[in-house]
Amino acid sequence: MHLVRLLCRHKTALVIGTVCSFAVVLVFLAKCTSETLKQGHQDPPGLAPRAIALQSHQEHQNPPSPSKDFSAMLVVLITTGPKYTERRSIIRSTWLAKRDSDVLAMFVVGTQGLPSEDLQNLNTEQGRHKDLLLLPDLRDSYENLTLKLLHMYSWLDQNVEFKFVLKADDDTFARLDLLKDELKGKEPSRLYWGFFSGRGRVKTAGKWRESSWELCDYYLPYALGGGYILSADLVHYIHINVGYLKTWQSEDVSLGAWLAPVDVRRTHDPRFDTEYKSRGCNNKYLVTHKQSLEDMLEKHQTLQRDGRLCKEEVKLRLSYIYDWSVPPSQCCQRKDGIP
């Protein structure tokens, strides 16, 4: 009875205490549930690329400033093979010979699986010139050109503070002086500059055969791979999305597909003579593809002697201005009067 009287006397306090205790328990359970859900939650795979793209945009607005090994206004990356020593030598002595100090040029070679003799030769060449970008995780072959592109752009984004990159082949001749002058007037963002094609039919045979192209009956618009320029932010975009990018046989076609949904400035320029065979020689050309060693030497000597590219201007094929107002398959009507 004494206990009952005590309970009755203090029932208000007991009720309040019970309510408070219950509330504390509810808050604790809610917090635990929230933390558990937070730890167990994962974004659907389809959302991951967008999250990365948004992160990239934020980083572009407030870019980090980590210390990098190199700094340049313009980087030149030249894809080459382990045994093409003479081509590299000619390029060093011609269009790379008098480059400015803010131009960084490197020859890109995959070294995975190379015989010891080839590795030794490359190491000797590297010791002499210090301009080889050796990729130990890449087997150098035509079939791996697209992977080489991803490897070298990832390295570039991680190791060089730069504004623009010129991608070229070891049979390309470039006017670095003129390219640099024009780049000074261009915004260093969202730039994709070269000679574009939008009506390239999907190859079904030969070394360019694409066995898994499912996007369209034509290749998506792309700058031809003999020489083109990208701004640094697009290289960064490729690097951070590398795990999501599908690779095709042709590296230039692959790049065009990767950048197809991106808001970039596609700048078609007929002064980039970068098709599968040269259109000839024009003194306005900035980049010329499919050049023999003799062609490079002659162009360099003519520039040194006469201040112009061509000993004599020659037109082997007509060129075109890309018409962005029509479907890609109708983009490119060749006409006279275009470099």
Where are these regions (language model features)?
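Secretory-pathway lumenal glyco-enzymes, predominantly type II signal-anchor Golgi glycosyltransferases
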Residues: 1-339
